[in-house]
Design a protein with these regions (language model features):
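Secondary-structure transition into beta-strands, especially the periplasmic turns and strand N-termini
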Residues: 1-6, 16-18, 64-74, 118-129, ...
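Acidic/histidine-rich catalytic neighborhood
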Residues: 3-11, 103, 113
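Transmembrane beta-strands of outer-membrane beta-barrel pores
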Residues: 10-14, 77-83, 118-120, 133-139
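Outer-membrane beta-barrel and related beta-rich outer-membrane complex signature
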Residues: 16-26, 85-89, 93, 128, ...
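Outer-membrane beta-barrel signature, preferentially recognizing the C-terminal barrel domain
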Residues: 24, 31-72, 100-122, 160-168, ...
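Flexible, solvent-exposed coil segments and beta strand-coil junctions
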Residues: 34-43, 89-99, 202-212, 216-217
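Membrane-embedded beta-barrel scaffold of Gram-negative outer-membrane proteins
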Residues: 51-96, 127, 134
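Conserved small-residue
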Residues: 102, 121-218
Length: 220
């Protein structure tokens, strides 16, 4: 006997994780001293445009069974679009704050999952085997300003890239002799045997402007 079952679903969910009760407005508190005077200061930066993160997810799959369930295959495909993505966005140090909870853009998750299992009974022997494989990806489809947004020391957000992609200096090998070291770097003490970093903007200086996106830690 062969059994075949199809599954199709759609769901819409909201997420408010990370949004405090008063995250939409700045907060002030007393007990702040400056010199010999006491006063009040802003202790929390508000965001009056903050809203829920929403996600629309589509799923399609099928279950296929052979020989009264002795061999079964299960496959699923999903697509999830998340809008108003909640993120703790870094702020410039001059603001007096390190970050602010914001709706920074949109993200798409998609993937395929497949599994197969078999059951075999021979006398007193009960044999069960299973195998599964999956492929899951995500990418940012929209970002505030559509500009690259560094986060932390070695990651960044960019439209078309995975969430939290690595943002690193690319190594091009080692300097073999002092003569090939660009003068600005030579003046800084770089010599033969030191790492040769890729000069992305070709100005002879290695700084944060030379970092590039180089994949992510998310497995396939």
């Amino acid at each position: 006997q062969t059994d075949l079952k199809f599954r199709l679903s759609y769901g819409k969910t909201g997420n408010q994780d990370g949004i405090g009760n008063y995250a939409w407005q700045p907060l002030m508190s007393g007990g702040i001293n400056y010199g010999n005077n006491s006063g009040m200061a802003v202790t929390s930066m508000g965001n009056n445009k903050l809203t829920w993160e929403t996600a629309d997810q589509y799923d399609f799959g099928f279950d296929l069974g052979f020989w009264n369930g002795k061999l079964n295959m299960i496959a699923d495909i999903y697509l999830k679009n998340t809008n108003n993505l909640l993120y703790s966005m870094p702020l410039h140090g001059t603001s007096g704050f390190t970050s602010i909870t914001s709706n920074i853009g949109s993200m798409r998750n998609y993937g395929v999952e497949f599994s197969i299992n078999g059951h075999l009974n021979i006398g007193k022997v009960n044999w069960t085997s299973s195998f599964n494989i999956s492929h899951n990806k995500n990418k940012l489809t929209k970002l505030l300003g559509d500009d690259l947004l560094p986060i932390g020391s070695n990651r960044a957000l960019k439209v078309g890239e995975e969430l939290g992609a690595f943002y690193l200096f690319q190594m091009d090998g080692l300097y073999q002799y002092d003569g090939e070291v660009p003068q600005p770097l030579y003046d800084l003490g770089v010599r033969a045997g030191d790492v040769k970093y890729h000069d992305a903007d070709n100005n002879g200086i290695i700084n944060d402007n030379d970092r590039v996106l180089t994949g992510s830690s998310n497995p396939d």
